[in-house]
Amino acid sequence: MEYHSHTVVTERKVTLLEQGQASDLTDYVANEVRVALVYNGISHTVMLASPENLEEFAIGFTLSERIVSHVNEIKGVDLEFTPEGVLIQVEITQRCFMALKQLRRNMAGRTGCGLCGVAQLEEAVKPVIRVDSDARFNIDHLQFALEQVKDNQHHFKLTGATHAAMGLDLEGQIIAAYEDIGRHIALDKLIGGCSMRHAKRPVAVLLTSRASFEMVQKAASANIQILFAMSAVTSLALELAEKSNITLIGFCRNGRATLYTHGYRLLGLNRASLAKAI
């Protein structure tokens, strides 16, 4: 198998086993690379990611992890592809760097869980951020957004191995979409991409994955007010969404969805049926 660290998908010869028969064919595998984030010359964490849109990832991660509070506090991002993986050098303001050093967090090896590698349990709980409340979204547009998902999952079509985070406008049009083997990294890429170059800010975000605690935490850090998930919602995610004033909707598929928190942002529904969710 020929592999290049900067490619997202690798073509490979495989053998399909089906009903007792073996057939040789060509398949596609999602590439997974080690990505090291270094802030002002100091190593911070190593993660596993799809090797594309890594500048967006670095910016989104830096924002969603509250290493900086504004994109202007990120002074530069440099990528270096090596045989071992990708080294991302992020330069932040001295004030932010000093605050980062004081966190004393050991995040090495974090791959898919927002709590992995945290030295003390109490350090896993960050102060709750309450998002703004001005966003509104007509629920009728959700189905339109879902119909666009397949066309915005190019790597998933080939490999079946990636998650996607997609930004929606008021009409349910997908205006930005990012894929990654890690669902939280896909969201970081979306957050970073929408923070760069004066990109249009989405009204809502649609995840192809479940909505876990970390996904809601990242959404709150980015002031994402409406979060749709095509899969399930976890208990801690629900609790955090309630406290953070985030409208959280899960199981968005086949013309149905389950509303968990803050339904007042959704238009086009029978308001009486939302009494317990508002």
Swiss-Prot record:
Keyword terms: Cytoplasm, Molybdenum cofactor biosynthesis
- Superkingdom is Bacteria
Any one GO CC term of the record: cytoplasm
Keyword Aminoacyl-tRNA synthetase set for record: no
The entry's active site is C113
Instruction: Tell me the residue numbers annotated for binding Mo-bis(molybdopterin guanine dinucleotide).
Output: F251, C252, R253, N254, G255, R256
Q: Per the UniProt entry, what are the Gene Ontology biological process annotations, in alphabetical order?
A: Mo-molybdopterin cofactor biosynthetic process
Compartment(s) where it occurs, according to its Swiss-Prot or TrEMBL record = Cytoplasm
- Give the main localization category: cytoplasm
* Gene Ontology terms for molecular function: sulfur carrier activity; sulfurtransferase activity
PANTHER family found in the cross-reference section: FORMATE DEHYDROGENASE, SULFUR CARRIER PROTEIN FDHD
Member of which family? Belongs to the FdhD family.
Stated role: Required for formate dehydrogenase (FDH) activity. Acts as a sulfur carrier protein that transfers sulfur from IscS to the molybdenum cofactor prior to its insertion into FDH.
Protein name listed in UniProt = Sulfur carrier protein FdhD
Origin species, per record, is Shewanella oneidensis (strain ATCC 700550 / JCM 31522 / CIP 106686 / LMG 19005 / NCIMB 14063 / MR-1)
